[in-house]
């Protein structure tokens, strides 16, 4: 056996710096089941600041790059860009049937990741939000016993300094590595890469405003000295070199559908929440869900609430047709308790801020069904969200915010729902259109206390965009709007949307 040391011939190093800013609450759990909440935040043991591990960043970037190159739900192979940039996996699914001798030979050729990703500690001690979650029984519409949980979240605006370093060896494809790095950096800049848990329900959205990039050619003495003397823990000068002459030739293979729908509140809305974000500690017994955004705490509709409502209405539609719920499970994900089989949801629902609202306290009392009188000591107060009309004086004070917009439907808008479906099938689009219709006509309320008329919406405008990579990244756009109670939609869009619903009927 040879004792000769095998070294890598590194010819270039690329250092990338940026600041990651959270756009929505993010759950970076430490997995401690004995904490004050069911999911505690991962913190630095010395400074008590939030910790973002390098493995979490690498996993998110690797998954994004793989989906960009190969689309969703595709197995990874050692020839993919993700394997070249982030290193080989322990085993590949397409190599399971190979002989042991062949497997051993392939493993000897495995390479580690040329991209070094540092762990990151938040710039400040983070602001923390507490969220409650509960599982709902689809038959009764009530909460299941012993299925409530709570978790800690990093609030929006938390910042993490990022540092990557790409090592380019003489025998590696430099252009391919630079293209792969450019794709993930651009993905972070566009806010298309999420981190942490529950990303499919609106958590973990983030972005990087600007990247600083330094490229060192180690075959040159000056660059070699510059890399050795580079200040790694202080403030660096502005980058003097960019990823030059890098043209992203890789086609985006992701097949995805986006639905953006604007609604106004017809009735008050109440999504119950704890009171840790309410400034008035003498607040009512029940308050609406708030979340921190730039400028203060804002009322929001959580992605989990919207997804749960859509999920149960989709089950109702399919059951009405007396068919199997496989379509719903494939769309919203499932967990089989017996076989332990599970699948993640392909439907991504964003958390949205509720605009143009006011908060009023309403007193209620429980009634004795036997006597018809009030229960003693059963008086309670709730503080739902009410739609508020924008006053003319406010418009004059802030002309930029309320300036005339060609999209007149937005002046009464309270909620803008954003939904993304990965790898959509035509019949699944038809099901989503039926769900959108129920929301549009106030037939599908969201939130709690819907039995007393709360949570009903009225549609104002909807935009549907389908990026279909199966047809060369074809972009298909459809729109629906409302004007004085009349639905506005072109004949072409009407026929196309009706086609999707017909496909659903054929499928079930």
Task: Give short role names for the model-derived ranges.
Residues 1-508:
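Small/polar/charged residue-enriched interaction surfaces, especially the RNA/DNA-contacting tracks
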């Amino acid at each position: 056996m040879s004792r000769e040391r095998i070294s890598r011939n590194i010819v270039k190093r690329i250092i990338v710096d940026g600041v990651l800013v959270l756009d929505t609450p993010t759950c970076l759990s430490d997995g401690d089941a004995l904490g004050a909440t069911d999911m505690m935040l991962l913190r630095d043991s010395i400074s008590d600041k939030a910790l973002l591990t390098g493995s979490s960043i690498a996993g998110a970037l690797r998954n994004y790059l793989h989906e960009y190159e190969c689309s969703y739900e595709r197995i990874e192979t050692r020839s993919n860009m993700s394997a070249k940039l982030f290193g080989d996996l322990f085993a590949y699914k397409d190599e399971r049937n190979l002989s042991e001798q062949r497997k051993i030979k392939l493993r000897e050729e495995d390479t580690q990741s040329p991209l070094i990703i540092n762990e990151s500690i938040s710039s400040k001690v983070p602001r923390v939000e507490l969220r409650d979650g509960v599982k709902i029984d689809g038959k009764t519409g009530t909460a299941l016993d012993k299925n409530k949980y709570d978790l800690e979240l990093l609030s929006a605006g938390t910042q993490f300094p990022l540092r990557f370093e790409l090592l380019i060896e003489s025998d590696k494809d430099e252009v391919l590595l630079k293209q792969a790095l450019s794709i993930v950096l651009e993905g972070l800049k566009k806010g298309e890469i999420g981190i942490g848990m529950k990303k499919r329900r609106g958590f973990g959205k983030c972005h990087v405003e600007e990247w600083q990039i330094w490229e060192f050619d180690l075959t040159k003495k000056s660059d070699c000295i510059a890399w050795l003397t580079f200040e790694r823990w202080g403030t660096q000068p502005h980058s003097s070199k960019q990823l030059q002459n890098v043209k992203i030739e890789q086609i985006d293979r992701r097949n995805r559908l986006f639905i953006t729908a604007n609604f106004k509140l017809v009735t008050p809305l109440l999504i119950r929440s704890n009171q840790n974000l309410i400034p008035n500690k003498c607040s009512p017994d029940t308050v609406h869900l708030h979340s921190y955004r730039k400028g203060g705490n804002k009322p929001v509709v959580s992605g989990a609430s919207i997804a749960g409502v859509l999920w149960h209405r989709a089950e109702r539609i399919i059951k009405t047709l007396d068919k199997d719920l496989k379509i719903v499970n494939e769309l919203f994900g499932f967990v089989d308790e017996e076989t332990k089989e599970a699948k993640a949801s392909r439907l991504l629902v964003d958390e949205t801020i509720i605009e143009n609202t006011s908060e009023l306290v309403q007193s209620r009392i429980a009634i004795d069904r036997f006597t018809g009188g009030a229960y003693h000591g059963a008086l309670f107060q709730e503080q739902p969200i009410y739609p508020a009309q924008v006053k003319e004086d406010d418009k004059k004070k802030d002309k930029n915010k309320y300036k005339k917009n060609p999209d007149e439907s937005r002046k009464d808008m309270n909620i803008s729902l954003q939904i993304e479906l990965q790898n959509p099938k035509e019949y699944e689009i038809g099901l989503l259109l039926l769900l959108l219709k129920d929301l549009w006509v106030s037939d599908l309320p969201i939130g709690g206390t819907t039995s007393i008329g709360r949570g009903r919406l009225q549609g104002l405008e909807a935009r549907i965009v389908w990026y279909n990579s199966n047809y060369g990244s074809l972009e298909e756009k459809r729109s629906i709007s409302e004007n004085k109670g009349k639905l506005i939609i072109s004949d072409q869009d009407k026929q196309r949307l009706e086609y999707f619903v017909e496909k659903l009927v054929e499928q079930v």
